[in-house]
Amino acid sequence: MPARLDARATRRYFDSAFNSPAVKILPNEYYVTNGEDVMLSTVLGSCVAACIHDPVIGVGGMNHFMLPEGDIHSPASATMRYGAFAMEVLINELLKAGAVRERLEAKVFGGGAVLSAMQLMNIGERNGQFVLNYLKTEGIPVRAQDLGDVHARRINYFPRDGRVMVRKMAPHHQKAEALIAQREAAAAQTVQAETRAAPRVERFARPGGMRVERFDTPSRRDPVGA
């Protein structure tokens, strides 16, 4: 399937904390580098981001999808909000940029049960299981993963060398509510319409702190993991 041009992230900025040019990836977007030294950043709740790169040529990309799969008979399923389409687009764009399929490596993040609406429908868990199954089917090794739990996550990905920095917001973090509830409302509404479930969105209490984790790429002789 050809990638929709309007799904490619275009929000560029300079991140002073990392002293790096950066691209912000919003839900339903993706970005693939062409060897440039740039950081890709996104915020995840129940959504999942796959970070895939070719370590030999330093080309990589990230997507951000909301739901696992849609009705294959519906035109709406061919949109970036569905993992099946978002993964296909990301991999195809990496290959167009010169990556070799047999060298692709992945790191996957998100799928948290952050909002009550998403907990009710197991969206985060379904997204996480989907991306792992998809990559296994495609034969792409998962070098690191941080899926599930109850945390919102900020992902900072450096495609050139495969590094990923994950900042986890504490459960019931007010800032997480503002970011995640706004960006994932569309996903909850979509699933509600499909399942007739009645989602609840609870408010978060005072922030309690954050935890930052780093996911480097192990050497090919190291065991798979974080």
UniProtKB/Swiss-Prot annotation:
Substrates-to-products reaction catalysed: L-glutaminyl-[protein] + H2O = L-glutamyl-[protein] + NH4(+)
Keyword Transport attributed: no
A GO BP annotation: chemotaxis
Keyword Phosphoprotein among UniProt keywords: no
Classification via InterPro entries: CheD-like_sf, Chemorcpt_Glu_NH3ase_CheD, Cytotoxic_necrot_fac-like_cat
Chain segments carrying region Disordered: 207-226
Highest taxon, organism lineage: Bacteria
Family annotation (Pfam families): CheD
GO terms assigned for molecular function: protein-glutamine glutaminase activity
E.C. number: 3.5.1.44
Chain segments annotated as coiled-coil in the UniProt record: none
Keywords: Chemotaxis, Hydrolase
Alphabetized PANTHER family for the sequence: CHEMORECEPTOR GLUTAMINE DEAMIDASE CHED-RELATED
Protein family membership: Belongs to the CheD family.
Its job: Probably deamidates glutamine residues to glutamate on methyl-accepting chemotaxis receptors (MCPs), playing an important role in chemotaxis.
Protein name (database record): Probable chemoreceptor glutamine deamidase CheD
Lineage summary: Bacteria, Pseudomonadati, Pseudomonadota, Betaproteobacteria, Burkholderiales
